[in-house]
Curated annotation (Swiss-Prot):
Cysteines engaged in disulfide bonds, as pairs: none
Function text: An essential GTPase which binds GTP, GDP and possibly (p)ppGpp with moderate affinity, with high nucleotide exchange rates and a fairly low GTP hydrolysis rate. Plays a role in control of the cell cycle, stress response, ribosome biogenesis and in those bacteria that undergo differentiation, in morphogenesis control.
EC number(s) recorded for this UniProt protein: 3.6.5.-
Listed GO biological process terms: ribosome biogenesis
Assembly notes: Monomer.
GO cellular component labels: cytoplasm
Localization terms from the record: Cytoplasm
Gene that encodes it: obg
Matches recorded under HAMAP family: GTPase_Obg
The protein's name in its UniProt record: GTPase Obg
Amino acid sequence: MKFVDSVIINVSAGKGGDGCISFRREKFVPKGGPDGGNGGDGGNIWIVSNTNINTLTDYRIKKIFQSENGKNGLNSNRSGKNGKDIYIPVPLGTRIIDNDTKKIIIEILKINQKFLVAKGGKRGLGNTNFKSSINQTPRKKTYGTLGENKNILLELILIADIGTLGLPNSGKSTLITSMSNAKTKIDIYPFTTLIPILGTVKAKKKKFIIADIPGIIKNASLGIGLGIKFLKHLSRCKLLLHIIDITINKKKINKIRYIILKELKNFNKKLFQKTRWLIFNKIDLLKPKKISQIKKYIKKKIEKNKKYYFISAKKNIGIKKLSKDIIKYLYKKNKEYI
């Protein structure tokens, strides 16, 4: 299934029903007064959060939403029925944007969140409302007003605590699988992660959500590769894990770091400024002596305040400590977080 995280829809709320002009016409009441009822209000259109969906795929085809018009008023002071409301379910993390002005209207971030995106038109008034001491037989009514009509951009930005980034085949998917309950496709080919994937990690009786996006390559910000368009899904993360394949030539480690950093900076400065930990993966493929040499090299080259780990996602080496440290970091950032 294609991962759809951005779609434009049209929402058109119902028109209000018109008021009615009518007079009582009953036996023995030859000059009955006005009895025209009011119209009904037009139906509203609501955006509602739904935890059972995680993409906007449903709206690739269905793009127009029209709620019911209010019914016209009737005689005998009978009001027209209100138009039925429409509810549009979206995943948590969906941003609602006015596509004409490009203004963010609201972000859907809470369970059971509900937002009125297009209000139905107001009902028209029947002639009963215009009776007065000087006008006992009013022939006046008002018409229902039009409902709101908007072009809305729905943009999904995943909600995750931790995000992973790195070159293709650095082991991001293996790490997510090792740490969490996510099931990702793992191969030796580039771009085996084709869509963002979320996993839940439990450690020390607490848990966090971790996101994996397709690998980023050099010049990704110019449109090369797959990862750059999914970088927005890391914007809500509190911590980024930069995964590096330790089996490469040690002198290329910093070069690889800066490839990713450059693409981050080009994409979004706020994302570039997020806290990042370096995760050196695949230590199971090297002999202890080689690992020791690389550790010494990295200690010289990496900034003193930079946090880094040596792990094997495949062999589950160092994963437990990494998970615990992430929990500590998140808890320290916000004591009410977990």
